[in-house]
Amino acid sequence: MRKMFICLHNTYSAKQVEEFGRIAYGFDINTIVVTKATASAAQSGIPTLHKMAYKLGKNVLFFEELDDAIEVLRPEKVFLIGNKSICDEKVDFNEVGENDLVVFCGASTGFTKLELEKGLGRYIVENEIGALGNLAIFLYEMSKKI
């Protein structure tokens, strides 16, 4: 599970970036990717995440857009974890591999249709619980596979 790229996309909250890092690094994810961070997420969230990563011997990558992350990382598959209203299928945790990019949307509006075309849209639970809730459940389920 350490090789898997976990991404927070389209966030404006420094606190969300920090908590995302705590959860992901807590599950021994080696590299966190952040794309399209704005406002306090970019100004103070990313520096806080870098500090956390350095102290833990982990990595953080920051890209302007999701396309940049896909171009550089070259994942085998891209999973966009959203809510049921925009994603057709429930996550099958067995289809997620070590070299995949798993993207969680930090904005309450979710992914746009254009963003969903970049990968496989999946949902975890029936109701909207946000990026942090989805991340925690996702990583817990993935940790059971090991």
From Swiss-Prot:
Keywords noted in UniProt: DNA-binding, Endonuclease, Hydrolase, Nuclease, Restriction system
GO biological process, one term: DNA restriction-modification system
A Pfam family this chain is assigned to: DUF2122
Coiled-coil ranges from the UniProt annotation: none
Residues of the signal peptide: none
InterPro entries: DUF2122_RecB-nuclease-rel
Keyword Nuclease: yes
Top-tier EC class: hydrolase
Record EC number: 3.1.21.4
Hydrolase found in the keyword field: yes
Reaction equation(s) it catalyzes: Endonucleolytic cleavage of DNA to give specific double-stranded fragments with terminal 5'-phosphates
One Gene Ontology term of the molecular function aspect: endonuclease activity
Function: A putative type II restriction enzyme, its methylase would be M.MjaORF1200P (AC Q58600).
Similarity annotation: To A.pernix APE2001.
Protein name: Putative type II restriction enzyme MjaORF1200P
Species, as recorded: Methanocaldococcus jannaschii (strain ATCC 43067 / DSM 2661 / JAL-1 / JCM 10045 / NBRC 100440)
Classification of source organism: Archaea, Methanobacteriati, Methanobacteriota, Methanomada group, Methanococci
